[in-house]
Amino acid sequence: ETETTVAFKDTAPAAPLHVLVVPRRHIDDASKLTAEDGPVLADMMVAARAVADQAGLAGPDRGYRLVFNIGPDAMNSIPHLHLHVLGGEPLKGHFITS
């Protein structure tokens, strides 16, 4: 949790680690980001890296996935910008469906 973002576990995890990083300020989704939102996006990325670091996934022999879902075809059901942080196992074939 920072001044601009919060992070919490997804209620329907698609991987052993599945955390959502959410800005406190409302933005509908990633398609609505503007140049003025650069600091918000940067803070979200830094928070996502912190989540991965805390989970031990940021090392050279590990990895994690960051995902923005936009619109109904991407199965986005949350009308607020959020970044999925996934990891904890090889992610071949993992897709976010909610």
Say what each PLM segment does.
Residues E1-S98:
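HIT superfamily nucleotide-processing domains
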